[in-house]
UniProtKB/Swiss-Prot annotation:
GO terms for molecular function: ATP binding. GO terms for biological process: inflammatory response. Gene3D superfamilies: Death Domain, Fas, P-loop containing nucleotide triphosphate hydrolases, Ribonuclease Inhibitor. Keywords: ATP-binding, Inflammatory response, Leucine-rich repeat, Nucleotide-binding, Repeat. This is NACHT, LRR and PYD domains-containing protein 4C. PROSITE patterns: DAPIN, LRR, NACHT. Residues 1-93 form the Pyrin domain. LRR repeats lie at residues 594-617, 689-716, 746-773, 802-825, 827-844, 859-882, 916-940. Residues 148-471 form the NACHT domain. May be involved in inflammation and recognition of cytosolic pathogen-associated molecular patterns (PAMPs) not intercepted by membrane-bound receptors. ATP binds at residues 154-161.
Length: 982
């Protein structure tokens, strides 16, 4: 409510009260101060005070918002609703003032700030359809009524910022969201990132028309606020901060990364709405960490838009069709043309090549070829064959600038950065003139590349010309670091960087580079790239981190069959997601050259589902056939994972035929969230393969009929499946009866995971089967199965009678202390065989630890106990530690993460460490352990009789002094590992 009184005056409202009302106001004020236990004002002063004096007294003794809140309450008690309504209208005046300011600002800045280079082609007037589309942005796809968190997803330069500007302009003109939002604030992440630290109040104030924004007024109705956050990818954040790092105070300065994370993860202003623009890569990185209510895809130019633009440039209809067809044949190039400014680049590049009488086929060979042709054309006059020395120097400096920007996440460059990389003030007009650089929309003295992909290709050219050691900035790393960073998707804004490096190694690109710069290039880079791939080949962990699609695009751009075969045979494991037609083409091109693969994980999302254009269908299926052929060509492949995929009938049959091939000997088949639009019996025929030992169907919908088909196969003698995962498959209690028959008949099934299915009443059927003497199951996982009180008696009976069950996980069920007591009665029996019990998130308290302690003292088989995420507190841990010290306890691992522990329990833990001869691992993350408590723990860990090897603590949860202690103790103790994930 800041500035409200200065703008409108409390005295003015008090003047509206007559003498009798004014005295009544004072009486009510006295009561309010007493009720709220506020600092007292002298009643003598209040009684004597004039209206002006009383207003000043209130403002002197209380914060403005508190004074206003009391005034509002008193007006309500006095039944002066007219004054309340008038105040409401006056406050709304802030909104109208801001709305008018935003309209003026957007109208004034529109052409400069959000200009698209093909504006003559893409100019549109607002229509009712536009307004309807904007309103539809905030129609939630989730059923629960929640504040909006909408992502606008699309490639860089495709028109997201323009769309957001149009939306804000429509709001400022009173056409949309008038009753929904009082304020819409626009934050450009390029500006936010420069601030380093800021509060939300500061960001809002920067957008306000006056020097002081009425922050309290604005934030008083958070549900009436819409924050538009543009270019989120610039922040390079993945929203992975711990909850404790987030902030809920709008006036507190924070690192801007934390501030945005606090907003988007709803720690701050949870009732407000957000509209966020981001690239697909950024959205993918944050998915699951930010709960979005809707995702809108911005696709840019469609086929008819691209064709129309080509026609406007080439005039000749026949020539236009010829050129358009050539571009369309290269799906990667055609995808580039969906971005308006890049469509202009492609078209003008081809036009220049025609004017020079050159062959367009070679230019359109690969995306790299088109980009380099365009860039070199910019620096070679139409009449000349070669560039001038000045042009060579300008491009070389530009490439140096681009490389620095890629490593420092800089896409807007000041004059200092230009000079540091050799670009003089006199060069700038030329670079602007040829349209490789343009003035930043934010500042007259800063510059950006025409599109981020042009910066990427220039940065790639730098590495062909010079070593990173020759660069003026130490931030620029080696070619090896570049390739690993690109393949591991460490930097989400590196879309083409690595693939351009590979593309520039093609013979024709080498010739172009040598012709332009006038000297021969070193062939050392090609050897370095192959060494990178060999390093990946020898490192299983690195192979898991490599994004297969990034690798495929690198090899595709290089267009070297021999190198491709060599590179693909370095890979034993590949994980990739093909999101569109272009991805499928590139993946197929590479996979058909692979013969050493052992593990393959793939997703084609909706690319191979129904509804594809007829012209694409045949090509798509051919590509899918090539992708599946790796199941035959790689003789040692033993794991296939297909996830998040919809396959039409033909695509399903192609996969089926390859999996049924005699030489395909998969041991593990993982099918997660997959829809096969074909006869499901075909799929269940696949799992009859006698080599198959592990079947994971998690997240894949299974009807009751599917469950019957599955269990028929599992019950067959020839079936060798030992591990079955059917979590979140929409199973019902009735399905438990079918699985129960398998538990009795199958001699192979050892592991069954039924998590995240509503099984409550079905547990009785499962339990009867588990008690059967023919049941050989060893591991049963029932996490989040909506188990009720009656289930614990059934499972207790299983624990008493089953002699093969080693592991039971019933986490995330309402077990509570009462249910735990029932299970512990069975686990405390001397003949209990269970070795591992997990009861995380089960609402267990200190009281439940008494029963667990009894189990630890009596059960000599229990080796692993997971009690994390239960509020057992220090008293509960004391009970467990006393039991762990008992000679009958042979526990090896215990999980106590997020159990509301403090440093006070460390003495008990230390005592357990030194007395228990079997304990080797403990997880203590997300507890309030202090420095002094940890010193006690480490003293115990130094003792010779202590056998603990793994300590679960997240070092970054502690202050600097404690972090140093943890690192020093880990270094001193060669047997100890402190891990953040246990």
């Amino acid at each position: 409510m800041a500035s409200f009184f200065s703008d409108f005056g409390l005295m003015w409202y008090l003047e509206e009260l007559n003498k009798k009302e004014f005295m009544k106001f004072k009486e009510f004020l006295k009561q309010e101060i007493l009720q709220l236990r506020l600092k007292q004002i002298s009643w003598t002063e209040v009684k004597k005070a004039s209206r002006e004096d009383l207003a000043n007294l209130l403002l002197k003794h209380y914060e403005e918002k508190k004074a206003w809140d009391m005034t509002f309450k008193i007006f309500q008690k006095m039944n002066r609703k007219d004054l309340m309504e008038r105040a409401g209208r006056e406050i709304a005046g802030h909104s109208k003032l801001y709305q008018a300011h935003l309209k003026k600002k957007l109208t004034h800045d529109y052409a400069r700030k959000f200009n698209i280079k093909v504006q003559d082609f893409s100019k549109q007037k607002f229509t009712q359809d536009d307004y309807d589309r904007f309103e539809n942005f905030l129609i939630s796809k989730v059923t629960a009524k929640k504040p909006h968190m909408v992502f606008l997803q699309g490639a860089a330069g495709i028109g997201k910022s323009l769309m957001l500007t149009k939306l804000m302009l429509a709001w400022s003109e009173g056409m949309v969201f008038q009753n929904k939002f009082s304020y819409i604030f626009y934050f450009c992440c390029q500006d936010v990132k420069k601030m380093k630290r800021a509060s939300l109040a500061e960001l809002i104030s920067k957008e306000w028309p006056k020097t002081s924004a009425p922050i309290e007024d604005i934030l008083s109705q958070p549900e009436k606020l819409l924050f538009v956050i543009d270019n989120l990818e610039v922040m390079e954040c993945d929203m992975s901060e711990r909850e404790s790092e987030l902030c809920d105070t709008c006036t507190e300065k924070q690192p801007v990364r934390i501030l945005l994370s606090s907003l988007l993860r709803r720690k701050m202003l949870p009732k407000s709405s957000f509209l966020i623009s981001a690239t697909p890569e950024t959205f993918e990185k944050m998915e699951g960490r930010v709960e979005c209510t809707n995702v809108k895809i911005v696709t840019g130019f469609n086929e008819s838009n691209i064709k129309m633009y080509f026609r406007s440039l080439f005039q000749d209809k026949t020539k236009t069709q010829e050129i358009f067809s050539l571009v369309k044949e290269n799906q990667q190039l055609f995808t580039v043309c969906q971005v308006p400014v890049l469509c202009w680049m492609v078209a003008t590049c081809l036009k220049k090549e025609i004017e020079k009488g050159r062959d367009l086929v070679s230019v359109c060979r690969r995306t790299t070829s088109l980009y380099t042709t365009h860039i070199f054309n910019l620096f070679i006059p139409q009449s000349a064959q070669y560039p001038s020395k000045e042009s060579q120097a300008q491009l070389q400096s530009l490439c140096s600038l681009a490389a620095e920007g890629m490593w420092t996440d800089t896409f807007v460059f000041g004059e200092e950065a230009l000079r540091r990389n050799g670009i003089m003030d006199s060069d700038i007009p030329t670079l602007l003139d040829v349209r490789i650089l343009e003035k930043s929309k934010k500042s007259e003295k800063s510059y950006i590349f025409l599109h981020p992909s042009i910066q990427e290709v220039c940065a790639a050219i730098f590495y062909l010309l010079k070593s990173h050691m020759d660069h003026p900035s130490q931030d620029v790393k080696s070619i090896e670091a570049l390739i690993f960073t690109f393949l591991k998707k460490v930097k989400v804004q590196w879309i083409f960087f690595g693939s351009f490096i590979f593309g520039l190694l093609h013979e024709s690109e080498q010739k172009k580079l040598e012709a332009f710069f006038g000297h021969q290039l070193s062939q050392e880079i090609k050897r370095q790239l192959y060494q990178c791939l060999e390093t990946i080949s020898g490192n299983e962990e690195l192979q898991e981190q490599v994004d297969g699609m990034k690798l495929f695009y690198c090899l595709f751009e290089m267009d070297d069959e021999a190198f491709l075969a060599q590179a693909m045979n370095c890979m034993e494991q590949i994980n990739f997601v093909a999101k569109d037609y272009s991805d499928v083409i590139v993946a197929a091109h590479c996979l058909q050259h692979c013969s050493t693969l052992k593990k393959l994980s793939l997703s084609t999302q909706n690319v191979l589902s129904e509804g594809q254009e007829h012209s694409y269908t045949e090509k798509l299926l051919m590509c899918w056939h090539h992708m599946c052929s790796v199941l035959i060509s790689s003789k040692d492949i033993y794991i296939l994972q297909v996830k998040n995929t919809n396959l039409n009938e033909t695509a399903s049959l192609v996969l089926y035929s390859h999996l049924m091939y005699p030489s395909c000997t998969l041991k593990a088949l993982v099918v997660n969230n997959v829809t096969f639009l074909c006869d499901n019996r075909l799929f269940f025929e696949l799992i009859q393969n006698q080599c198959l030992q592990h079947l994971d169907l998690n997240l894949t919908f299974l009807s009751h009929g599917d469950v019957k088909l599955l269990c028929d196969v599992l019950s067959q003698e020839e079936c060798n499946i030992e591990k079955l995962m059917v979590a979140a498959c929409n199973l019902s209690p009735d399905d438990c009866k079918v699985f129960a028959s398998v538990l009795i008949s199958s001699k192979m099934l050892k592991h069954l995971n039924l998590s995240s299915n509503n099984l409550d009443k079905g547990i009785s059927s499962l339990s009867k089967a588990l008690c059967h003497p023919d049941c050989v199951l060893k591991n049963l996982v029932l996490v989040n199965c909506s188990l009720s009180e009656q289930c614990w008696d059934y499972l207790s009976e299983v624990l008493r009678r089953n002699k093969t069950l080693n592991h039971l996980d019933i986490s995330s069920n309402d077990l509570k202390d009462e249910g735990l007591k029932v299970l512990c009665g069975a686990l405390s029996l001397p003949d209990s065989v269970l070795k591992s019990l997990s009861v995380r998130y089960c609402l267990i308290t200190t009281s439940g630890c008494q029963d667990l302690a009894e189990v630890l003292r009596k059960n000599q088989n229990l080796r692993n106990l997971q009690v994390s995420n239960n509020k057992i507190e220090d008293a509960g841990v004391k009970l467990l530690c006393d039991a762990i010290k008992h000679p009958n306890c042979h526990l090896e691992n215990i999980g106590l993460e997020a159990c509301a522990l403090t440093g006070a329990c460390c003495e008990d833990l230390a005592s357990a460490f030194t007395h228990c001869k079997t304990l080797w691992g403990i997880n203590l993350q997300e507890n309030a352990l202090d420095h002094s408590g940890l010193i006690v723990l480490f003293e115990a860990l130094k003792q010779q009789q202590c056998t603990l090897h793994v300590l679960g603590l997240r070092i970054t949860d502690f202050d600097k002094e404690t972090q140093e202690l943890l690192m020093a103790e880990e270094e001193k103790n060669p047997h100890l590992s402190i891990l953040s994930s246990v």
